[in-house]
């Protein structure tokens, strides 16, 4: 009769730590939400909807109104994150080919090999692609980076993030190996940031403009992307191991089996979207739509792709519960916040517009 070995949490944790050590992405994202997916493939995230501040009015008569200004109820935006990736393996060890006892040590060796060659590259590739697709900032460069242009291009992209109030620090510059030479041979690389005793993730050659530099194999780097900057609080990559077990004396064969299944995904946090920025190839970014509001209607003009919009101020680029496909002028009322974006097949998504309806 077959005997099933359900590996302990301690062994699973050790495997996760090994993956993190090898991964080029595991150090870069926020793990705070990981536990929310422990019992579900879907998590609804509520983010506070902020509004403009009031000016305190000392001349206001308290009997007729508040000196603090108009009272506005705090609202929120709901976004839905769903794990879409579901990978598995079912591997056998025939007793005629391997006389070693099937145990934790043996299964660990098998999983180590698959982690190195299959699991880690697939997860890293997917994460980078998904974060790049959902990034809040996409900048199309006129030409591919060179030794004389790459430093300015990186600084400009980082500045675009800071101009959107993205805090400095906890950021990683991901760059394809194709363009690492251009960066490291640039004159400014000689003035590399002092690490100040900071320990860098494995494989990172240094820091530049306050960012950890993480070279990535061109084989797993997103297409039409030269480099990208991701701030830790802006990106997540939840996963959960559904099955991890060994079956001794399996039926239909003289040997043992190892079964593994893992669900995972990667997302950009909508309220932190500007903390993910991508330098793209020319002509690969969907143009941002233009919006005209008049006569109680919002009219959108877009040259490419499908336009999505919201009326509550939530970001239509993400899994907003309020997002709808635009087909004709939309009725709006005072207080609505009309936002829209365009998504075209084979291109990076556009920026999101922001129009507050005041009349």
Regions found by a protein language model. Give the residues of each.
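Signature of extracytoplasmic/envelope-associated structural regions
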Residues: 2-5, 15, 32, 36-41, ...
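Extended oligomerization regions of viral-like shell subunits
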Residues: 39, 44, 161-246
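Short helix/loop capping segments that flank catalytic or ligand/cofactor-binding pockets
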Residues: 53-56, 91-92, 182-185, 269
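Long, hydrophobic/aromatic-enriched structural stretches that serve as scaffold segments
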Residues: 70-108
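Alpha-helical scaffold segments that mediate packing/assembly in large oligomeric complexes
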Residues: 94-164, 279-282, 336, 359
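Short, compositionally stereotyped local motifs that mark structural "simplifiers"
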Residues: 281-359
């Amino acid at each position: 009769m077959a005997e099933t070995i359900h590996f302990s949490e301690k062994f699973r944790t050790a495997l996760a730590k090994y993956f993190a050590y090898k991964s080029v992405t595991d150090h870069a994202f926020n793990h705070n939400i990981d536990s929310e997916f422990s019992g579900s493939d879907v998590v609804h995230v509520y983010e506070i909807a902020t509004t403009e501040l009031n000016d305190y009015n000392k001349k206001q008569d308290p009997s007729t109104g508040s000196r603090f200004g108009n009272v506005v109820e705090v609202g929120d935006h709901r976004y839905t994150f769903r794990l879409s990736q579901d990978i598995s393996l079912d591997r056998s060890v025939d007793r005629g080919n391997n006389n070693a006892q099937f145990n934790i040590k043996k299964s660990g060796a098998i999983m180590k090999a698959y982690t190195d060659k299959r699991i880690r590259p697939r997860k890293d590739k997917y994460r980078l692609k998904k974060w790049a697709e959902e990034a809040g900032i996409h900048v199309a460069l006129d030409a591919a980076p060179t030794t004389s242009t790459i430093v300015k291009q990186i600084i400009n992209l980082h500045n675009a993030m800071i101009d959107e109030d993205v805090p400095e620090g906890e950021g990683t510059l991901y760059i394809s190996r194709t363009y690492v030479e251009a960066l490291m041979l640039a004159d400014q690389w000689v003035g590399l940031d002092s690490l100040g005793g900071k320990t860098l993730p494995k494989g990172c050659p240094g820091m530049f403009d306050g960012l950890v530099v993480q070279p990535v194999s061109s084989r797993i780097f997103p297409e039409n992307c030269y480099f990208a900057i991701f701030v830790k609080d802006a990106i997540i990559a939840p996963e959960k191991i559904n099955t991890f077990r060994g079956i001794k004396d399996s039926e239909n064969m003289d040997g043992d089996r190892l079964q593994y299944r893992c669900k995972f995904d990667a997302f950009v946090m909508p309220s932190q979207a500007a903390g993910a920025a991508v330098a793209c190839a020319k002509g690969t970014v969907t143009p941002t739509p233009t919006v005209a509001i008049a006569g109680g209607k919002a009219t959108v003009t877009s040259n490419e792709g499908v336009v999505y919009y919201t009326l509550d101020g939530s970001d239509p680029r993400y899994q907003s519960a309020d997002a709808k496909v635009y087909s004709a002028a939309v009725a709006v009322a005072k207080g609505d916040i009309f936002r829209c974006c365009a998504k075209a097949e084979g291109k990076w998504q556009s920026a999101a517009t922001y129009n507050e309806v005041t009349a």
